[in-house]
Amino acid sequence: MASLSSLVLLLAALILSPQVLANYENPPVYKPPTEKPPVYKPPVEKPPVYKPPVENPPIYKPPVEKPPVYKPPVEKPPVYKPPVEKPPVYKPPVEKPPVYKPPVEKPPVYKPPVEKPPVYKPPVEKPPVYKPPVEKPPVYKPPVEKPPVYKPPVEKPPVYKPPVEKPPVYKPPVEKPPVYKPPVEKPPVYKPPVEKPPIYKPPVEKPPVYKPPYGKPPYPKYPPTDDTHF
């Protein structure tokens, strides 16, 4: 019996080994569970079989604590609802007829003038109230230091000054008295005559040089000045 059971276990291990062990060449493909529609089976009425009551001793089963299954919250994408534009409803203007209100004429009420007699009010003389002089302690005010204000340098544009033409100043001619120089009598120096041989110079013919006629300028350098204002 033991050998038969061991043989059966070996055969089952050999048959189930490719299904139980991991196959790295052909990994298992996940197939989602298929839900088959329930097949209606009519109830089969079997005759009641008498089974004597079997009294089994009570078996203690500890309570099975299942870990809580985490279900992530399902986030539904927001559904876009386009704004509904209602067409404007035309409401005709309601014209109320004008209500006529007749003018109310009130009769004039005569009010006689009220003459009040003059009331004499004697002058009230108040005694002088003495107010002692109030001496306030001096309030210390710290000196206020103002930060220096930056003033950028002011660049003045150059002022054009036209050239000033001064009129010529008349200077009268200075007449110096003549200085008398007595004649200097030098003794005659005798120079013997030097006889130079005559040097022949061929006549040089110069071309005529054109000289334009020289005339004075039509106006003087300075305008004539009147000597009477000096």
From Swiss-Prot:
Q: Name one GO molecular function term.
A: structural constituent of cell wall
Its domain of life reads Eukaryota
Q: Which InterPro entries match?
A: Adhesive_plaq, Extensin-like, Proline-rich_CW_protein
- Signal peptide feature range: 1-22
Would the keyword ATP-binding be found if you checked this record's keyword annotation?
A: no
One GO location term (cellular component): extracellular region
Spans of the sequence repeats are: 27-31, 32-36, 37-41, 42-46, 47-51, 52-56, 57-61, 62-66, 67-71, 72-76, 77-81, 82-86, 87-91, 92-96, 97-101, 102-106, 107-111, 112-116, 117-121, 122-126, 127-131, 132-136, 137-141, 142-146, 147-151, 152-156, 157-161, 162-166, 167-171, 172-176, 177-181, 182-186, 187-191, 192-196, 197-201, 202-206, 207-211, 212-216, 217-221, 222-226
| 40 X 5 AA approximate tandem repeats of P-P-[VTIY]-[EYGP]-[KN], as annotated region | 27-226
Q: Where is the composition biased (Pro residues)?
A: 78-223
Specify where the region named Disordered lies, as residue ranges: 78-230
Q: Which UniProt keywords apply?
A: Cell wall, Developmental protein, Repeat, Secreted, Signal
Q: Provide an example Pfam family for this protein.
A: Extensin_1
**Cell location:** Secreted, Cell wall
The main place the protein resides is secreted
Q: Does the keyword Protease apply?
A: no
Tell me which family the UniProt entry assigns to this protein. Answer: Belongs to the plant proline-rich protein superfamily. ENOD12 family.
Output the PANTHER family linked to this UniProt entry.
Answer: PROLINE-RICH EXTENSIN-LIKE PROTEIN EPR1, REPETITIVE PROLINE-RICH CELL WALL PROTEIN 3
Any idea what job this protein has?
This is a developmentally regulated putative cell wall protein.
Question: Any idea what this protein is called?
Answer: Repetitive proline-rich cell wall protein 2
Gene behind the chain: PRP2
